[in-house]
């Protein structure tokens, strides 16, 4: 990353596993000579306004652009730069379906300037495509292209007609490009394999995922009991359409997602509430509301609560339970900004412990989050190379440092609070006179 919000010079954060033998289940180990060993967890610390959220924002922006959008309002270059270079840059290396890729872009508020995708391993980088936009238009180079002359001509047509505010990655998939099948793997990861949660993000909710799955319902109830929320279950309740203040634009958007006349469901926030829309093959739809079920300990009867009656912390936790189920069952990567927002500090640790307990050696998953919760700095729980610190320098730019560089002693938490690793607020010692 470089020249983006608080990031000035080219900066990287890496979750490639070091040589430590600690917590071996936390590592997706290389099976072949050229493979890359990858950590399954990452924790980012920093004081308020240090820039730790900007690291996640940069990846979220890259995801949006990879998926075909170019949100100009989120293109925020580093404003304190003393350099004439104006292009921002974000690149990510990721693993999906057993292959590792590097995808990146250089951009300004006006659009994409460069874009590239490489298939990588520990020794070599193999080009899939490289794109540069000049005054003459798109200039491309490609790696190995499979197929005949017709395939090659279609590929060149898509390449040279891709607009500057759209990624070639998304255009290739949208226009059914052929010859570079690894692009589909990379695009699918951005669309389905990378999931980013900000403090304002609401996931679809537990009941939307488990309504017709007895096994998932039982897993959900077990997690609700484990986190001691007081909620015994979550359920869907059908509501009348006339009781929902649904704008025509939102309804059109929901119904437009029907594909080939197939039934489907989707969640949407309406008036601050999460609702589930089930659309049948003919375009008819039903609306459901998610509610929390409590149990009266004296009588044993169930009492149903609207989610608006639950605390912010309980709702935040309810959003994380589908994530934990997803991580346990699928090869996905989650990034969370401020995991401890609105929650008791002990819950962050319980979420991490729950994730670690479900890790399996044959499944590549990853959970990365930013936090202030220093109780997680425990080498009995985590590896040193899983932890990064973000600190702002005098130039106003964010700088990143790995805990592994410090060769930490056992009591990492104490060292952090004493300022040994930086990334804490620098407050004046004298009293405020006001």
Features from the language model and the residues they span:
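A short, compositionally biased
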Residues: 85-89, 108-113, 283-289, 383-385
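Conserved P-loop NTP-binding catalytic core
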Residues: 27-49, 53-112
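Extended helical coiled-coil dimerization/tether regions that scaffold
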Residues: 2, 202-309, 420, 430-434
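Electropositive, glycine-dotted interaction segments
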Residues: 102-257
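Short beta-strand segments that buttress and anchor functional surface loops
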Residues: 90-95, 117, 292-294
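Short acidic/polar mixed-charge low-complexity motifs
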Residues: 7-9, 97-101, 111, 123-125, ...
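Switch/communication elements of ASCE P-loop NTPase nucleotide-binding domains
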Residues: 1-64, 287, 291-430
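Short Pro/Gly-enriched beta-strand edge/turn motifs at strand-loop
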Residues: 72-76, 271-274, 371-373
